[in-house]
């Protein structure tokens, strides 16, 4: 049996967030829902403050944070930046209709590739992705490549390098979500 995962979701579409919640809870996971990026960061910050090192072996309050890329108040990218400042090891998964833009922004702004799910998608696809924790280590390897590209080029990857990153991310994410 898979361990129970703690998942924080920020999504302004209440119908979509309900689908995510039902799919995750059906597999025994604990879900915390927020409706915008500001609320998500506030909930995450409070969870970090309550976290004791002995509570969770990973020393992070959530196994995954799911962020809608385009949200009111604070968008997903800004929320991710704030969360990553609090905990650089936090697993972030963007849900977005704009995967290329999201990938480029995550590399430029977060200095790393994050997992992506292209809207629309079946909620079970997201659950499968969250449960596949092997993706995290493979993403770490991909992010080492991003760091090397950034060091060599003195900045962010160029257009052709983004295409390569997109292809590598597709291979890492076995679910074919992008």
Each PLM stretch: what is its role?
Residues 11:
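Conserved acidic carboxylate
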Residues 18-26:
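Charged docking surfaces used in two-component/phosphorelay signaling
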Residues 51-66:
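Active-site beta3 strand of CheY-like receiver
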Residues 68, 96:
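Active-site residues of response regulator receiver
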């Amino acid at each position: 049996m898979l361990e129970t995962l703690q998942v924080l979701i920020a999504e302004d579409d209440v119908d979509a967030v309900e689908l995510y919640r039902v799919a995750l809870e059906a597999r025994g996971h604990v879900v915390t829902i927020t409706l915008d990026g500001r609320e998500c960061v506030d909930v995450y910050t409070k969870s970090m403050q309550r976290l004791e090192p002995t509570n969770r072996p990973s020393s992070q309050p959530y196994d995954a944070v799911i962020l809608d890329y385009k949200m009111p108040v604070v968008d997903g990218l800004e929320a991710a930046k704030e969360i990553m400042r609090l905990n650089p090891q936090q697993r972030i998964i963007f849900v977005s209709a704009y995967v290329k833009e999201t990938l480029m922004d995550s590399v430029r702004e977060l200095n790393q590739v994050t997992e992506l799910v292209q809207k629309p998608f079946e909620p079970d696809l997201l659950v499968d992705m969250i449960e596949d924790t092997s993706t995290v280590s493979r993403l770490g390897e991909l992010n080492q490549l991003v760091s090397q590209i950034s060091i060599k080029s003195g900045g962010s990857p160029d257009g052709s390098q983004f295409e390569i990153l997109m292809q590598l991310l597709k291979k890492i994410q076995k679910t074919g979500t992008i």
